[in-house]
C-alpha cells in the first residue's frame, strides 16, 4: 500500500516525515531501512564536498540543490538517533542555537566589552576552550577529530598550536622551513630510504600547509585551484594532440604541454 506523507506540515517537519516514512520497518524503502550512521557517513562527507564545489563555481541553482542534500543527511542522522532514543532534530537545533548565543554575548547578552572582530575571535576561542575542557580535554590539541581529511586536520592542529604561541613569526620564516624540508627529502631520496622518504614527505606537506596558513590562503582552495588549472591545461594539450594526430610519447606530450600554458 502507498505511504501517505502528512499534510499541513512546515518544510522541516515535512522532510522529517519523509525520512521516517522511508525508514518505516514495514512499508519503507529496503535500502533506507538498512542504513545507519556509519553507512551514511561517506554520503554525508560527499554532500558536504558538493556544497563546497557549488559555492566555488558560484552556481546558486546547484548550491540550493546541494544544501538540500546536505540538510537531508542531517535529518537522516537525527532520525536514526531518535530511533535509538539518543536525541532528535529538535535537540540538535536547540544545542546549535544555545552554542551560537553563548559564543555571541555581544549580540544576545549585550556584552559591551566585545566590540571589534579581534574581541569576537578572542571570546570565540575562549568559549571553545571551555567547551573542550568540559569534555575532558587535557591538551589544546584534544578534540581535533582524527576522521577529518588529513589536510584539514593538519591545519586545525597548526591553528591550535599557533594560538598558544607555538608558531613561526612570519611567512618568510615558514618558507625557510619548507626549503629545509625539501633538502631533507632530497637527501633521503638519494639514500633510497623508503621509511624516511615517507616521513620527510609528510613533513614537507605539513610545512606547505603551514605556509599557506601564514600567507592567509585557504589551503583547500589553493589545491582545488591548482587541480582545475592542471585539468584545463591537460585537456587543452589532449585536444591539440588529437587534432594534430600526434603520437602519444613523452617528447610530444611535453612539447604540447608547454604550448598549452
Language model features with spans:
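Flexible "arm" and connector segments at domain edges
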Residues: 3-66, 72-201, 205-261
